[in-house]
Amino acid sequence: ERKLAVLLGIPLNGVDPSLNHIGTKSGSRKAFKEAGVSLPFGFEDLRTDGEIADSLYDMKRRDPGLRRAVVKLNESFSGEGNALYRYPEEFSRAAIRDQMHHLQLSIPKETPEVYLDKFSRMGGIVEEFMDANEKTSPSAQLRISPSGQVMVISTHDQLLGGATGQIFL
């Protein structure tokens, strides 16, 4: 898109490819931190099973009352790249690692092994699972023009459902 826009001398109405990383789960967490935006405690730029397990362990050590965490693929949307992790009763690195094979996946026919393989290729994040009796999931779509003008395209509250309650319906 960028090369074509330059060749034709027209504005690029899309993301410059050099900025694509900001749109990933890891990139978004980093951008939010830099901007001082509150976000769930967690870790980004993870790739391996070991990094996921270490992050889950560190989160539980930081908050012994933590019961669940969410693992998210970097390049996913509509909640389909999210998996819920339930902490085992035993608090040990081995127990936490073993429990990873029991991830509750958003896509019913996928297995934890397939999910973790995708994670190793794509990377992702692990963060504390935020739960409440009443859940909302506001969404906004904005457009930034080539001149830097920001325009709100739409806003809405997303309906969530599916096996993990994280799929946008």
For each feature predicted by the language model, list its residue ranges.
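Catalytic micro-motifs at enzyme active sites that drive phosphoryl/nucleotidyl and oxygen chemistry
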Residues: E1, G124-F129
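ATP-binding N-terminal substructure of ATP-dependent carboxylate-amine bond-forming enzymes
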Residues: E1-G23, K30
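Short, well-ordered alpha-helical microsegments
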Residues: E1-R2, I52, K135-S137
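Short acidic, glycine/serine/threonine-rich loops at helix termini
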Residues: L4-L7, E80-R86, P138, T164-F168
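Beta-sheet entry/capping signal
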Residues: P11, R67-V70, G81-N82, G123-G124, ...
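ATP-dependent carboxylate/phosphate-activation module, predominantly the ATP-grasp catalytic core
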Residues: F91-E110, E128, N133, L142-L169
